[in-house]
């Protein structure tokens, strides 16, 4: 008990630091208030092709790409234009969040089947 009295200020300081860290973690990883305004775009990989292979979205919109691989083989979703590259295991899905994009045409492709897995995300004005 004597140790607690002597170190009371240190204990309070440590508790306050712990509380500050917990608040920071919550704010960093907490619920995203902008999720209400996120546009979900679903693309399926089927027979080594993107379905649909052209997707149109409005400008200034946060996008969640949901890529589902319906094939029996692995694929790598890739886009140099979007600076994204992600493995999609057979019969699984991945999510890719995109910040609002400027109007334009963004190429996407399957790195393991580049001759067939091709497409575009078109951002309209």
UniProtKB/Swiss-Prot annotation:
A GO CC term attached to the entry: membrane
Membrane-spanning residues: 10-26
Pfam families tied to this protein: Cupredoxin_1
Subcellular location: Membrane
Primary location class: membrane
Topology class, membrane: Single-pass membrane protein
Keyword presence, Zinc: no
SUPFAM superfamilies reported for this sequence: Cupredoxins
Protein's UniProt keywords contain Lipoprotein: no
Domain of life: Bacteria
Keyword terms: Membrane, Transmembrane, Transmembrane helix
Protein's recorded name: Uncharacterized protein RP394
Native source organism of the sequence: Rickettsia prowazekii (strain Madrid E)
